[in-house]
Amino acid sequence: MHSASVTKKSLFSAAVCALLAAAPAKAIIFDEAVSGDLSNNKAAPTALTLTPGLNSVIGTVAGFPPEGTDPQDWVSFTIPAGFVMISYVNSKYDSTDPQGFTGFQFGSAFLGDEFIEGSYAGYAHFGTAANNPDGNPVSSSTVGVNLLPLMADPSFAPGTTGFTPPLAAGTYTFLIQQGNPVTTGYQFDMNVRAVPESGSSLCLLGMGGLAILALRRRLGYLDRRIR
């Protein structure tokens, strides 16, 4: 009975370890071309739950009226228990305007004035030639860049309430904005991973269990040979 119990636990732990080590899944969790416009209401953002691996959101924003028609996309991301969001990458940007704006707040809705720095936990301009308030007068491309560490840097995003990456389990409301009346296409990729401690413990448990199982079988084999 004890041997069977060890076997089951070992195999289960090894399977979990293999899953954690496998290549991360990739999924487009929202594409405005397929699912329609993301919410324009900060009090009721489009609610999305992130899954382990890469989660992509694709959309467009097009400036404030009267010349523009769709300046803001509001979306809330929920990170499940036991996981963290390790990156927020501006993977694509297509616009005649060199930059847009993105920022987030803790919670399932955005409270306060989105035009005040103190309403955000972190923010950044993004685009092919983005200017950010970090003391650097030279604009730079954020395409392919993980924005989370920059958004958490008070010299890069001054006046915010602050946060420490990675983002822990919970819900966060993000704004993606283009203030000028030009159509701006974007893609953001959120990478979600298991909390490192949990993964390490399961892997160690699996390897330890398999080692015990192998030893028991080896001893049993030697015992039969001796008899």
Residues of each region from the PLM?
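Predominantly extracellular/luminal regions of secreted and cell-surface proteins
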Residues: 28-52
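Acidic, Ser/Thr/Pro-rich low-complexity intrinsically disordered segments
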Residues: 60-158, 167-171, 177-181, 192-194
